[in-house]
Design a protein with these regions (language model features):
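Internal helix-loop-helix
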Residues: 47-118, 159-165
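A structural signal for short hydrophobic beta-strand segments in well-ordered beta-sheet cores
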Residues: 139-142
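Short Pro/Gly-enriched beta-strand edge/turn motifs at strand-loop
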Residues: 119-125
Length: 184
């Protein structure tokens, strides 16, 4: 089995490393101290293809694959954990929407994540009583006509104030065993 990186994977890692050195490390401490969201850097990262890394090109993604994506996020994390978490979650939001949503929802949101029109994507999982233990969430979603009605509370939404789109996790089948019957 060959564990060497491909030239493309090395290029993406090196690009993320270079971007982190030049754009993230110099401002990371200041952003943290000021509790400032890195809108400018996230837009630049989208322009470099770092948002939507595992998304098909027809939706605006860069299709670099899981290894290259992991390498890029690792390099970003070396400069600032906050940038890395936002990048990681935003990519995961794009992946969930691409995989599980209707074509209409995919076409509306995924290109805007990939091109940086949305500063970030967010997950709403965390609840006051259970933290981020998704198997124990209590928020419910009940289908009414052509929509869902949510009932419950989320206590932390990653990048919530800056997100252009939020994927909310809720129980849709209360009769299912623990950890099952949950939808996004």
């Amino acid at each position: 089995m060959n564990f060497n990186l491909t030239p493309e994977q090395e290029m993406i890692r090196d690009m993320a490393r270079d971007f982190t050195e030049k754009n993230i490390k110099p401002v990371a401490a200041q952003y943290d101290a000021e509790k400032r969201f890195p809108y400018d850097n996230l837009k630049k990262m989208a322009e470099l293809g770092l948002m939507g890394m595992n998304i098909p090109a027809e939706l605006g993604g860069s299709e670099v694959g899981a290894v290259a994506s992991s390498l890029a996020i690792t390099e970003i994390a070396k400069g600032c954990a906050s940038h890395a978490v936002t990048t990681s979650v935003t990519n995961m939001v794009a992946e969930v929407i691409t995989e599980f949503c209707t074509e209409e929802v995919r076409k509306k949101h995924v290109p805007r994540i990939c091109n940086g029109d949305y500063p970030a994507g967010s997950f709403a999982i965390t609840e006051p009583h259970t933290g981020s233990d998704a198997a124990n969430i209590r928020m419910t979603a009940v289908r009414r006509d052509n929509t869902y009605v949510l009932n419950g509370t989320k206590s932390l939404i990653t990048s919530g104030e800056a997100a252009g789109v939020t994927v909310t996790w809720a129980v849709t089948d209360p009769a299912a065993r623990k950890g099952k019957g949950i939808s996004a």
